[in-house]
């Protein structure tokens, strides 16, 4: 991650550090179980406020993008909207995000219909996923760096990994 953050300031150092990380004896995260998680002791806070408090929902920006591409990760990441079953918006997508910046008073009565993140009480909280590392490796490979695979193969691997992470 650090290498991609400095690539526009010092590309040669970025390349050096990325290649050192990928090719070191320890290596980098490559499978979803390698991801950095915060262990939940009592109750996952996302589960507490996302579906129950009514004031936090999935962003419409992200959901519209994913709907537009029929992104199959939607069913892994989100619960379906209940608007269609309530008859609120006939013909809407199964996944409906809440528009950013809307005033709380404007959506209180409808907030329960928007899609929520799929999360349970005991889910650990993902901090740094292996899929992100693999996407970064794909970006490095696209720049011609030695990332242990082609940009295409690493990108596809990252997408695949992202299905196991949430």
Residue spans for each PLM region:
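Short coil/turn linking the two alpha-helices of tandem helical-hairpin repeats
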Residues: 4-12, 145-147
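Hydrophobic-face positions in mid-chain alpha helices that act as interaction patches
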Residues: 15-137, 142-143, 148-166
């Amino acid at each position: 991650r650090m290498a991609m953050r400095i690539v526009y300031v010092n590309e040669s150092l970025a390349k050096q550090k990325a290649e050192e990380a990928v090719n070191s004896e320890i290596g980098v995260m490559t499978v979803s179980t390698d991801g950095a998680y915060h262990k939940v002791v009592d109750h996952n806070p996302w589960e507490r406020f996302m579906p129950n408090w009514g004031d936090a929902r999935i962003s419409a920006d992200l959901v519209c993008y994913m709907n537009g591409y029929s992104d199959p990760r939607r069913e892994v990441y989100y619960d379906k909207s209940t608007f269609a079953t309530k008859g609120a918006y006939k013909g809407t997508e199964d996944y409906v995000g809440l528009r950013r910046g809307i005033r709380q008073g404007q959506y209180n009565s409808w907030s329960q219909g928007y899609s929520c993140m799929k999360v349970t009480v005991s889910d650990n909280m993902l901090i740094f996923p292996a899929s992100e590392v693999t996407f970064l490796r794909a970006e490095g490979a696209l720049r011609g760096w030695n990332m242990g695979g082609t940009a295409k193969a690493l990108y596809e691997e990252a997408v695949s990994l992202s299905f196991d992470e949430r």
